[in-house]
């Protein structure tokens, strides 16, 4: 495939709820264009795009696949994305590489939760949008209801470019409202005829609506049109359509059935003729505040919107060419790492199959292998000075901890997780020193399940989930004094240390050590040993093995032996004194607290607030946003919201979102402390 000119490239990202038929639409377009000898399907595991073992097993898309389709003189890059919330990060990153987001909506189910969320994301990106109403031949399909729902949800700018002739089992073709023709797809061929008489009225109504919306792209023409002075001619309508779409004045709606390939060829014609090309779209925003428009004549540069690891090829970087052109052998600089990367090969991906290309011009999408210092969100350019400001990835909030079945695989497990985190921005690794545990933050149960299967099938590591340890802490509530005396005689030189400690609470100020020893009761050179012994005892905890914090410690008296006193003896004495004082100082366990902002539809707010109360949380306040959603601000023990990602989805039917940040510690309730102490004591037996 020769490198197409920028004006002849169309980058379309397919988005929407899982099951609406995004992959089927891409497969239908591939087949209708002649790119594939048969139409791939997900249900039998023979999709060209859903080729991953996990995708075949689950029958839906887990990550972005690319389908490059040659159509006439154009190249249509279809970016097929996941409709699962757990893989939202990959979908959002891919949307940055497109000029048009095509929302695939089921004719029966209508727009679902993920459709709505991605619609608002596309709107925020200033990404052009269109809709394909799929499965119009499905039982109980209703085009009018689907359109009404779309208008109610997304506004009045949506207008039908094609409408169905019949629905459900009576569906036989589509009416092309733009050209006022009827289209029938029979076998491998399409037949275009005049509109049947019984559909002329409904076609004219749709045509008038189309003209009303598109006319707004030209102010002078719109005034004449609205005043009734003249109607839009076919030529005027076609000339204004691409402008109206690019300026988001008009959002086209198409209809069809991917399974029987109805409505597909006309859709492809309109994509080529009227959808925005990369240069006509808005700019990329750079980290330095400047803007960069896609331009064939500019400095060679590309933006990495996806990274994956292939077991045979290695790391593969999916790149949107921003300016100039790229070709094998080029050496580009990474704006983030400042390292040079050589473009060994340029591929165009067809599902999992790489196809070598000699060059790629601005606006096109390619894949480059083996750029090991480059990751998702990076920008590469000849100078290294161009850096796109990427959209932030969704923050993973669902924590898990993993252990290898075989202890010998622990290092391999850590290495694999680190590499996965490099290519997947929604996978975050944090090691908590308080618990000596590495926690993997994910997007949800499905994300975890896929990760475990990759461990098993790709890395050949068997691993299992273990409970995430909460970073509890311990402290004291009263002032107390105690002596620690260590004396040991073993026949030679012995050990002797004796010190008195005063412990007092020091809320929020951490650990402070001081000496009030006078008269040489403890030599000055052994005072640091007392400090070390106290810190070692604090690290071990007193009640349940959690580190102790916020304690003011004063050593004020003691005694020593000229021969037997040494650093080890006074460290031991300090530990004994510290534990004896803690016993009198009313020790408690502190639990980490989380501040959360929970955003849900008003209908779910009551259930969410009730649920937070059962988690020992406090409602701090409520607010609302521009979408009419309720924002609930809460403070809750972190231990109670480890699984909140999936819990909120259940409470809000998948529509809720939240942020969480650890913010301080508070005394744990008695029953929580009792349970933690019992667990600790049982583990020591």
Q: Where would I find each of the regions flagged by the language model?
A:
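Structural and coupling elements of P-loop NTPases
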Residues: 1-685
């Amino acid at each position: 495939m020769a490198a197409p000119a920028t004006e002849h490239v169309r980058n379309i990202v397919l988005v929407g709820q899982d099951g609406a038929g995004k992959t089927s639409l891409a497969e239908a377009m591939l087949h209708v264009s002649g790119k594939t000898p048969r139409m791939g399907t997900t249900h039998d595991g023979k999709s060209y795009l859903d080729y991953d073992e996990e995708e075949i097993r689950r029958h839906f898309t887990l990550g972005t696949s690319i389908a490059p389709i040659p159509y006439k003189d154009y190249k249509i890059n279809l970016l097929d994305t996941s409709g699962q919330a757990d893989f939202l990060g990959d979908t959002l990153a891919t949307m940055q590489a497109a000029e048009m987001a095509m929302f695939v909506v089921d004719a029966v189910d209508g727009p679902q939760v993920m459709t709505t969320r991605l619609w608002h994301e596309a709107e925020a990106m200033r990404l052009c949008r269109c809709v394909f109403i799929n499965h119009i031949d499905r039982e109980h399909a209703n085009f009018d209801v689907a359109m009404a729902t779309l208008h109610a949800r997304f506004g009045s700018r949506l207008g039908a470019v094609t409408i169905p002739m019949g629905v459900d089992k009576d569906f036989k073709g589509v009416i092309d409202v733009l050209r006022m023709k009827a289209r029938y797809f029979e076998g491998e061929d399409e037949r275009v005829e005049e509109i049947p008489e019984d559909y002329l009225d409904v076609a004219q109504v749709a045509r008038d609506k189309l003209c009303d919306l598109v006319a707004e792209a030209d102010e002078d023409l719109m005034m004449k049109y609205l005043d009734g002075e003249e109607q839009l001619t076919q030529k005027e309508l076609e000339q204004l359509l691409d402008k109206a779409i690019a300026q988001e004045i008009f959002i086209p709606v198409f209809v069809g059935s991917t399974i029987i390939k109805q409505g597909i060829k006309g859709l492809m014609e309109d994509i080529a003729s009227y959808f925005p090309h990369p240069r006509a779209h808005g700019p990329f925003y750079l980290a330095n505040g400047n803007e960069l428009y896609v331009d064939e004549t500019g400095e060679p540069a590309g933006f990495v919107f996806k990274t994956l690891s292939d077991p045979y090829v290695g790391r593969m970087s999916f790149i949107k060419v921003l300016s100039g052109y790229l070709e094998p052998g080029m050496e580009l600089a990474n704006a983030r790492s400042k390292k040079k990367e050589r473009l060994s090969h340029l591929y165009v991906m067809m599902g999992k199959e790489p196809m070598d290309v000699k060059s790629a011009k601005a606006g096109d999408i390619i894949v480059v292998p083996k750029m090991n210092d480059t990751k998702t969100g990076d920008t590469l350019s000849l100078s290294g000075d161009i850096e796109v400001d990427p959209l932030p990835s969704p923050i993973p909030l669902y924590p898990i901890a993993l252990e290898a079945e075989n202890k010998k695989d622990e290092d391999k497990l850590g290495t694999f997780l680190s590499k996965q985190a490099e290519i997947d921005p929604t996978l975050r690794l944090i090691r908590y020193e308080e618990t000596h545990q590495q926690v993997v933050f994910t997007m949800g149960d499905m994300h975890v399940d896929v990760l475990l299967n990759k461990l098993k099938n790709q890395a050949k590591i068997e691993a299992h989930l273990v409970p995430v340890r909460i970073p509890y802490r311990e402290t004291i509530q009263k002032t107390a004094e105690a002596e620690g005396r260590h004396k040991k005689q073993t026949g030679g030189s012995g050990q002797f240390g004796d010190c008195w400690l005063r412990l007092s609470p020091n809320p929020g100020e951490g650990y402070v050590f001081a000496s009030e020893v006078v008269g040489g009761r403890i030599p000055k050179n052994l005072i640091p040993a007392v400090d070390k012994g106290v810190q070692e005892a604090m690290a071990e905890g007193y009640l349940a093995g959690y580190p102790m914090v916020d304690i003011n410690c004063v050593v004020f008296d003691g005694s020593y032996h000229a021969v037997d006193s040494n650093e080890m003896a006074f460290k031991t004495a300090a530990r004994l004194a510290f534990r004896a004082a803690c016993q009198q100082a009313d020790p408690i366990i502190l639990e980490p607290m989380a501040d959360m902002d929970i955003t849900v539809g008003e209908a779910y707010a009551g259930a969410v607030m009730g649920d937070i109360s059962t988690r020992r949380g406090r409602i701090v306040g409520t607010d609302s946003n521009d979408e009419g959603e309720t924002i609930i601000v809460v403070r809750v023990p972190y231990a109670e919201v480890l699984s909140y990602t999936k819990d909120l989805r259940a409470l809000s039917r998948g529509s809720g979102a939240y942020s969480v940040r650890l913010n301080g510690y508070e005394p744990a309730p008695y029953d929580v402390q009792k349970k933690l102490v019992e667990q600790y004591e049982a583990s020591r037996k």
